[in-house]
Amino acid sequence: VQAATNTSQVNSNNLINPKLEAEVLQIIHNHPEVVVEALQAFQQQQQKQQQQAKQSVLQEIKTNPNKIIGESPTTGATEPKILLIEFSDFQCPYCAKAHKTLKQFMARHQDEVTLVYKHFPLISIHSEAMPAAKAAWAAQQQGKFWEYQDALFAQQNKLGDKLYVAIAKKLNLDLEQFNQQRSGNAADAVIQKDIETAMRLGIQGTPFFVMNEETFDGAVELSDIERILAKNSKKNLSNLDLAPRPEYALN
């Protein structure tokens, strides 16, 4: 009886006063601009918050880059002047194209640029994006991220568990350790942290890049990255004080 009474009270509390509802609907009918203005105000507030979050990340890249880098794989200059952060998805065809361009770019600027890889698997459209990211992270724990990354992009049309194990064998990884780590909670935590950083930047697709404080996206051409590098090289980068980091060469 008590339960029935409580349910009745809840339902009663949830009921909308018909008179009040009619008045509200009449106001909306007579003044539709009120709804439009409210929506616009909400959108502006959302955009403001997103912009603030983005600027916070960009400022952090400038003042405390090692915090942004964290334990992400890096290649290139160990004492860099230019920081290039890549957000990528192993199942994204545009990322595979950008990967080839980045290899050419880094071959030219190994002593000047530090490339940082961040995972941003688009799981809503790419079913193998997350498993591939976990496999790459597990390979990183054995010092083979960049080689593993190359293999994933080179065989993007074959993504799946069979390929992940085959690449691990080819790179002479400890398979037991590899399989344990790619299925463990640590991989999820690291990738989720990268995703959160991407969301703060307002990233909606891949590939996405940040060079120092400048952002750009898509399957960029080599000439585009060179132009952005030239622009950033002219800036005063005295605040970009990175501690030396282990280097993994791009093959």
Where is each model-derived feature located?
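C-terminal cap of thioredoxin/glutaredoxin-like
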Residues: 5, 12-21, 25, 169-251
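Short amphipathic alpha-helical/adjacent loop interface patches that line ligand
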Residues: 32, 99, 195
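N-terminal targeting signals for export/organelle localization
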Residues: 1-63, 245-251
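Structural alpha/beta surface segment adjacent to cysteine/selenocysteine redox centers
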Residues: 85, 90-91, 96-169, 173-174, ...
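A short beta-strand-turn-helix
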Residues: 65-82, 107
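Soluble non-cytosolic domains of exported or imported proteins
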Residues: 14-18, 22, 29, 93-96, ...
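Soluble periplasmic/extracytoplasmic beta-strand elements of cell-envelope proteins
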Residues: 25, 38, 83-86, 114-118, ...
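Short amphipathic alpha-helical surface patches that mediate protein-protein
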Residues: 29, 40-43, 153-157, 169, ...
